[in-house]
Amino acid sequence: MAGRLIVISNRLPSEAAPSGGLVYALHETLRKIGGIWIGSHPETTETPSESLSEYGDQGKYTRLSFSLSPEDYKNFYLGFSNSVLWPVCHRRGDLVELGRGFERGYSAVNARLARQVMKVARPDDMIWVHDYHFF
């Protein structure tokens, strides 16, 4: 692989050594080959930035965070991602809850994140978009 591996997930690994599962596997891979992990900042802000922020260097790879407003968190994360997509992706249509602004909030966050990733991605980078938060 000529370029960097860029992992995009809803959350960043919060520990220096994540415990088990896919997060651990990706963390160890990035520690060996380098790259970037992009995920949401753990705290909301009234004015989300149009740029990614460095969240801490993990040795050979960098963690970058994107910010969410309380409204983004409500509509993108709690709303469309967790109340619509999660139930649909897990064959639990009976749990789907629709709300005003869910789809619009989801689309806005994904569009903003796409613009942010374009600022750091290089043509030869491999981008791994993980999970339904970023369909």
Predicted regions and their residues:
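Short His-centered aromatic/hydrophobic patch
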Residues: 131-133
